[in-house]
């Protein structure tokens, strides 16, 4: 009987029982007790914890009601990047996706794909250590997200402790946080009763709920989490499955919820059959989806296929056909972007399309206006391409009013009145004003200070706009001349914020050549291209002096990008900006040339597993790479050596089975010493 147990024993008993009920309800979709019995147990649990606060544990079901509010979200760096997916919009895209895979793997046989609905919510990473939830984070930019642990702990179907005993000691689960349609309706009814603004759609409601600083608010929102993949995995107690679908089944055994519509199919044809089936079920599902995700099911194939800069080669999101509605074009305004691009923006009669109200849509350029034959006053068809980006795809010619007006493209910049030029072969017209143009200046400054560029903490978009409007900043180097006194007088600043900003600007002066190149905003030079340029040329001076042939010798730099880089460094005002930044103290460490084929471990594949005591995992990986080795995350027949730390797990077993060379940490350190000696 329960009264024969101590409070601690009874509490453990109740927690285990409630966790089992949650598993039956959320994972197996098979509730075994009435709500009244569940509620009775929760009340008893709360009574015991209130009377014995020392017995309250972090993984107690009571912790799902939320704790103290936060002042801000901390940043979290993903140990394994959370990449996005490439998209397919039609059957040809899917067939091409399968062909790319077969060509790369050099196979002709059918490929097994794991198929699941693409949930329309917010991507989240949840880290478990020794079975206990220790951290949750948003995707962010894929490398750095926000710590939302306290909020995720309140989600009803997220286990605070994993079931069973055979899970890895560190296990990162990735999935989507969503809100059901019924939950969304209930939430909006409550919002309206409180006199608050209702949410536009379930996705926005879910995202807004997760980013509440007060977890009690999140706890009151009807959120659910569904797992779709693994991220970081360390110290496996039992081997993970050799397919994506079997690994998801393991997650389910450990208490993590999965989509009920998961299937494994053979080849692109069956994938398309699954896509059409889910499309027909779409309106019957309890939650919003915007497509289907297909992943190569075989993990070894995934590893061989690898990744491109932003997405895996072995997965694709097949989006549903865009949703369309009719609206009226009220006006066209012309916006100026960071690179001077003049973009016509359609102002529309607000129209509800695919879950959101659309009042603006891009018309891209003059060529698109001509193609559509569009006039102000026309009735137009709006499409949300990929359920995201509003586009005007056609006009309804027989509804054109008598007073419809032609759209007149400006001859001079609508912001600074500089001349507009349109180069031969380009569809985009551009303002020639450069940093003289306030619109370009604002966007260029935002780019310069952004996280992927110089990463100036506290220098947000609104403050940059204020600084440009006040003419305190006309060039990037002006940031480093800002004084505390004038900054303190700006809206929402104050002396403390001004001091922090000046210190952050000083800190940002130490950067890398790649980040500096990216910060300059050279057309079509993203992070990866900037990194390739830096590693190839080693110095800024070498890049400045490079001709077109030399630039095209850089990995991933073609004719067009080479021309943009070449032109940028031939413009005198760009060189003046660079000179001013260097004079202000912006600097970076010298880059050593990587002669990979001459390095001692060139061409060798290493795998790290288990716990290292002298060097941490990242340091060991960096050291191996500096010696020319490729460091892989999994053991295969192509592996040359496995470095096995403590509690090595299944990778060690697999390496031994394959006859792969195995060394311990001491062996690795001795090797490093020999190679450097």
Curated annotation (Swiss-Prot):
Cofactor: Mg(2+); Mn(2+)
Limits of the BRCT domain: 596-677
Enzyme class, first EC level, given as a word: ligase
Recorded catalytic activity of this chain's protein: NAD(+) + (deoxyribonucleotide)n-3'-hydroxyl + 5'-phospho-(deoxyribonucleotide)m = (deoxyribonucleotide)n+m + AMP + beta-nicotinamide D-nucleotide
Protein name: DNA ligase
Keywords, comma-separated and alphabetical: DNA damage, DNA repair, DNA replication, Ligase, Magnesium, Manganese, Metal-binding, NAD, Zinc
Similarity remark: Belongs to the NAD-dependent DNA ligase family. LigA subfamily.
Example of a GO biological process term: DNA repair
A molecular-function term among this protein's GO annotations: DNA ligase (NAD+) activity
Residues binding Zn(2+), per UniProt: 413, 416, 431, 437
Catalytic site positions: 118
Enzyme Commission number: 6.5.1.2
Described purpose of this protein according to its UniProt entry: DNA ligase that catalyzes the formation of phosphodiester linkages between 5'-phosphoryl and 3'-hydroxyl groups in double-stranded DNA using NAD as a coenzyme and as the energy source for the reaction. It is essential for DNA replication and repair of damaged DNA.
Residue numbers binding NAD(+): 35-39, 84-85, 116, 139, 176, 295, 319
Gene this protein is translated from: ligA
Domain of life: Bacteria
